[in-house]
Amino acid sequence: MFRALPAAQRRAARAHLRAGGVLAYATESCFGLGCLPGNARGLRTILRLKGRPNHKGMIVVGRRFADLRRLVRPVDAAGQARLMSRWPGPTTFLLPADRRVLPLLRGRHRTLAVRVSAHHGVAMLTRDLGPLVSTSANFAGKVSLKNAAACRRTFGQEVMVLPGRTGRARRPSAIIDFASGRVLR
């Protein structure tokens, strides 16, 4: 079970994120790399660390949909009910992105991938730090890292590695285009 970060570590993580830093943290199936969704420096660092093309876009996780609303266009009551039928859980939805969302975050798309995670550690982390980018901690196309030690070995001092255990999921979250209902992953 994930315990809340001690106050000093929480303050350090918050300052690190605000300065454009990147965190490595446990998620449902692997460790993820994250930064603040509106921080271009952090987004560029993640893309560089992973060797990920900037046209692909990244996922943002939050503790609840209310935390993610400023990043997407308004969703009506029926749409919110659809989201809540799958959240919290391992489903990522592509929603129309707010016009202020950085292209580095959404890639070449007009949508943004968002998820309300059921992983207790992610929920606690986003409660304390706000919504975070969540992309697998790995080099693009390679195996995802499963623990903090592997993240330290791979990324060294370039990321702040937080303690935590991954969930039991063996696969990454499903990705569903909200408008069409099409399952993309």
Swiss-Prot record:
One of its GO terms (cellular component) is cytoplasm. It catalyses: L-threonine + hydrogencarbonate + ATP = L-threonylcarbamoyladenylate + diphosphate + H2O. Belongs to the SUA5 family. TsaC subfamily. Pfam families: Sua5_yciO_yrdC (PF01300). It is found in: Cytoplasm. The keyword Zinc-finger does not apply. Its EC number is 2.7.7.87. Keywords: ATP-binding, Cytoplasm, Nucleotide-binding, Nucleotidyltransferase, Transferase, tRNA processing. HAMAP family: TsaC. Residues 7-185 form the YrdC-like domain. It is an enzyme of class 2 (transferase). Required for the formation of a threonylcarbamoyl group on adenosine at position 37 (t(6)A37) in tRNAs that read codons beginning with adenine. Catalyzes the conversion of L-threonine, HCO(3)(-)/CO(2) and ATP to give threonylcarbamoyl-AMP (TC-AMP) as the acyladenylate intermediate, with the release of diphosphate. This is Threonylcarbamoyl-AMP synthase. GO terms for molecular function: ATP binding; double-stranded RNA binding; L-threonylcarbamoyladenylate synthase; tRNA binding. One of its GO terms (biological process) is tRNA threonylcarbamoyladenosine modification.
